[in-house]
């Protein structure tokens, strides 16, 4: 699969803005997140790959996730985007939450179709990350794309989150020693 080049402005801090090409997968302690938590019985159970300012996942929607006219619900597509975009700052040793996100829907997705969601950091200023994302279908058509601002966790929040989700404090999300 070809990586996206992340159309739009270039990152100001020299970070890459393309999507992962088979990055690092990190297994967290079970948790209840609807998108990536293994403990949520009705969740999506996404596995996130991380690489240099980017995050990605591949996922197949089953019929539980359809909306009108037997297409994957737009809210589920938004969740895919939100998840990979929020994970993209992880290579900067940051956990992030959505502050603002704008989505453009370009095409519909069918249940049973393999979807690839990718998010990448385009700009970083202190704890604020500008991130772009896209969901593509099995045929590489763009189904949805988004841009947003994400707020990184404070230093004390990072320590608590790493402990809660089973990541050693001295290790970043990509497995490199923290600075």
Predicted regions and their residues:
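HotDog/MaoC-like acyl-thioester-processing domains
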Residues: 1-24, 110-111, 122-179
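Hydrophobic beta-strand-centered segment that forms part of the acyl-chain substrate-binding groove
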Residues: 6, 83-116, 121
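Short Pro/Gly-enriched beta-strand edge/turn motifs at strand-loop
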Residues: 26-33, 114-116
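Hydrophobic core residues within well-ordered beta-strands of beta-rich domains
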Residues: 44, 97-99, 115, 129, ...
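Residue-level recognition of well-ordered beta-strand positions that form the cores
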Residues: 58-60, 102-104, 118-120, 134, ...
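Short amphipathic alpha-helical face segments that pack within enzyme cores
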Residues: 76-80, 84
């Amino acid at each position: 699969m070809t990586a996206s080049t992340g159309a739009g402005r270039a990152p100001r801090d020299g970070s890459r803005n393309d999507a992962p090409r088979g990055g690092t997968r990190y297994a967290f302690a079970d948790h209840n997140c609807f998108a990536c938590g293994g403990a949520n019985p009705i969740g999506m159970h996404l596995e996130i790959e991380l690489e240099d300012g980017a995050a990605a996942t591949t996922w197949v929607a089953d019929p539980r996730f359809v909306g009108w006219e037997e297409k994957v619900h737009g809210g589920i597509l938004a969740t895919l985007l939100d998840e990979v975009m929020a994970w993209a700052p992880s290579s900067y040793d940051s956990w992030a939450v959505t502050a603002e996100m704008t989505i453009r829907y370009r095409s519909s997705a069918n249940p049973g179709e393999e979807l690839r969601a990718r998010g990448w950091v385009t700009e970083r200023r202190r704890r604020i990350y500008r991130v772009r994302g896209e969901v593509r279908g099995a045929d590489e058509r763009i189904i949805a794309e988004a841009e947003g601002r994400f707020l990184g966790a404070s230093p004390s929040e990072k320590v608590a989150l790493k402990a809660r989700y089973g990541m050693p404090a001295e290790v970043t999300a990509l497995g490199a020693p923290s600075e």
